Amino acid sequence: MYLAAVSAGRRRPGGDGGGGGGGWHLAAAGWLLLLALLLGQPGTRALVCLPCDESKCEEPKSCPGIIVLGICGCCFMCARQRNESCGGVYGLHGACDRGLRCVIRPPLNGDSITEYEVGVCEDENWDDDQLLGFEPCNENLITGCNIINGKCDCDTIRTCNNPFEFPSRDTCLSALKRIEEEKPDCSKARCEVQFSPRCPEDSILIEGYAPPGECCPLPSRCVCNPAGCLRKVCQPGYLNILVSKASGKPGECCDLYECKPVFSVDCSTVECPPVQQVVCPLDSYETQVRLTADGCCTLPTRCECLSGLCGFPMCEAGSVPQIVSRGDGTPGKCCDVFECVNEVKPTCIFNSMEYYDGDMFRMDACRFCRCQGGVSICFSAQCGELHCDRYYVPEGECCPVCEDPVYPVNNPAGCYANGQIQAHGDRWREDDCTFCQCINGNPHCVATACGQSCLNPVKVPGECCPVCEEPTYITIGPPTCELLVNCTLTEKDCIYSFKLDQNGCRICQCKTREELCTGLISGCSLDCSFGFQTDAHNCEICQCRPRPKKCKPIVCDKYCPFGYLKNKHGCEICRCKKCPEMPCGKICPMGFQQNSHGCVICKCREATASLMPPVKTGSCLSMDGRRHENEESWHDGCRECYCHNGREMCALITCPVPNCGNPTIHPGQCCPSCPDEIIVQKPELTSPSICHAPGGEYFVEGETWNIDSCTQCTCHSGRVLCETEVCPPLLCQNPTRTQDSCCPQCPDEPLQPSLSSNVSMPSYCKNDEGDIFLTAESWKPNVCTSCICMDGVIRCYSESCPPVSCERPVLRKGQCCPYCIEDTVPKKVVCHFNGKTYADEERWDIDSCTHCYCLQGQTLCSTVSCPPLPCAEPINVEGSCCPMCPEMYVPEPTNIPIEKTNHRGDVELEVPNWSTPSENDIIHIHRDMNHLQGEYRSGNGPHPSEDASVSSVALVTVPITIALLVIIVFLLINQKKQWIPVSCYKAPTKPSCLNNQLVYVDCKKGTMVQVDSSQRMLRIADPDSRYSGFYSMQKQNNLQADNFYQTV
């Protein structure tokens, strides 16, 4: 049998004191009567507290003293006064007021005192020598961080309180970054001197720090330290009694206990139970010995976890810690148990072969790859220069070897080599670097010539020529400039400094102000919200302006998910930003893609930029009849919605399919259900880190796509929001939906009103709400019901939902039945690299030498192969992977027109005639190393004079070529099917094709990729919000004539 004990009364602010116990005694009498009945039966002592419901607590009125929490810790009650009963079983008789103690009188029959006696409240009499000691607090393993000296200091300690300001390193770093970003100009700030207060023993000092956007630190403060709250352990003959509850303020942080004496007890008649010796595990200790309330017997000791014991193990190189068992803070399981295991790194898969971390494999004849962290880093072999007229490439090799000239066959005998007889003309491999041929009975052997374009080449087992895994960087020291001679200009004459030559040395010419300002801001990558600072010459420098002081706090009732626009002073105005901020760490050689709204998204653009649809703007009319501005977000009670280019986009929710013929959506519910159902399953909303469409595809913020032929979706704030077609009323009981239709349709001929000439028949219908509908007018009172006015009578039809075969059917807003979309969308996989997500077939750059490609979830990377150079001391240019000869280097090579001022002061546009070298791409860039080496060896490289003449012809031919290409592109777009030829990739030294699971190309026949460009988009007219959020229409009207649906 259980006793449910509930205290009656709760303290409220401003509650008065004085008077008697109020109505609490009447309520307690019933409990005490029940308690007396229970205590009469042996073995029935138990207490079960009901769940706390503060609304059912009665406020204690006219209390003569303080109010205290009841035994269940839920409701407040009046403290017991002098000569009133206290204590008892489970403390049901209440606690004494301040200044009083609960005294338990010894039984008259000489029995021992137990913990269930009822005491009496008497005046306290206290001496410090009654204290035996303190119980330690209950420590927990806590992890967190604090900002100390501008850095995040993180630790894991076992303590009674949480001394950390931030729960994790990420939250601490975010706060530190926000402080740095919003750090104002504090050079003129005046802060008051803040003195640290002296904290009481029960609290600790928290030093103040400057919050984000402020210069002056907050004052230091004292906060309660639970580790200082120790419960007293009293001497024999004394009880530990709660005197006052903690208030949570420094100085009143701990519950105040005092040792109260009990009447002397004769322990000679007390028989103590045997106490077993406790053996604590190695991670814990045995607590102090405690006595019973009468001081006659000792209580069993217990084991507590040792403080500061848990930590993180340090493993040797090549091994990582792995959790064997989780600790729960109990003795024997105080800490997590770790073991050092060999570090398992992800493997690489290529051509159905699995390679472990560090393994090297051959991609083709000239390309090798090494598996590093699950990513294949690929590089090319380094072939040397041959000094012969005839050469060939041995089978399975990359680098060519010299071949002896053709001699007449004088002795067709064979050759004996390595224990085998080789026929005349046979070739064999003597070792990794030596290849031989039998000519006229004698073996003729030549060695492979290897090149070296890096300082630390890597030898591949079984290969002759080493490979370069990393490019070599050469540091160029600053030039030594000579003094200007025969120059009459001084520092005073050139107030904007002197001009510099290509070596960075002064020349006898003064800089203009424009040249000075351009040089100060060029190459600056800062994104300053309030503009750049200026120097003494009023030139912008690469430092951000602080937040302007004159900006007033914006008062705006608009909800802008992307923030507000700023005026010319850098202050926010009540207008919404069109595009969100795009935090993206990708390096995209062709720039970033844009969504249909013209906003940049974190996705690399392909080499040929696709034509983007025109930008559309406008407000949205929601199905509930409310108008929302563009880019506005709201919640309609079931799903999150967003106005995107004039279209209402709402989240797809997962609902079960109702098993009845007349489902409906009840008020306050989101999913359809049968009329007799009471409990309706709530819809499930997913919250992924990036948008994960139901079909399995991943999309980034701002990206728009078609989930099927009827639904267009966009990625907004990590949620997939979709716009769907509004379906007309269904005037039949069992509509069907075909695969090529977006809305259910009636299989039979729709209902038509009778052509009766009876004038007494009414020409309208009236529903229960008093709405008038004309004859033949149809409408939808809710998403599952369609009605029509027929001959003065309203006839309604309920839509029945067909069964589905998928596990998570989705429900579009404005429709009745959930349906499956997993089978209609092909699934795509993504690549995860360095904490970023890349789409399938997306390319990106790690640095100027390493290019990566995502193929079916596998990341493949390649490095640039640099050709040998004809100069002795090549230089390395910043931003370029391969070194180049000094005579080939032109600062900042570009094909963008540059403004230059001639000697007359006129501005001219000059296009530099140096071609910009492109880096090695995995597929599309063709590079013939032998051809390039031959040009440099023969001195037939590009010359500026030749390129100048070519560029003049290009100025005429390039616009014509571009115009023809644009015409061809538009003709191809208008076709139903497009056939796009993919060019062949050629290996550096022989005309073979690359077959590495990236793109398979047949060089002889060519590869044709079929693209289906037929996509249908539906533009929906605004629904009529007069009838329960849906529209009304004349059934006999032609839908196309009313422009209700338009195909674009």
From Swiss-Prot:
Pfam families: Antistasin, CRIM1_C, IGFBP, VWC. PROSITE patterns: ANTISTASIN, IGFBP_N_2, VWFC_1, VWFC_2. Residues 47-124 form the IGFBP N-terminal domain. One of its GO terms (cellular component) is extracellular region. One of its GO terms (molecular function) is serine-type endopeptidase inhibitor activity. Disulfide bonds join 49-72, 52-74, 57-75, 63-78, 86-102, 96-121. It is a single-pass type I membrane protein. InterPro entries: Antistasin-like, CRIM1, CRIM1_C, Growth_fac_rcpt_cys_sf, Hirudin/antistatin, IGFBP-like, VWF_dom. Residues 47-952 are extracellular. Glycans are attached at residues 83, 486, 758, 913. It is found in: Membrane. SMART domains: IB (SM00121), VWC (SM00214), VWC_out (SM00215). SUPFAM superfamilies: FnI-like domain, Growth factor receptor domain, Leech antihemostatic proteins. Keywords: Disulfide bond, Glycoprotein, Membrane, Repeat, Signal, Transmembrane, Transmembrane helix. This is Cysteine-rich motor neuron 1 protein.
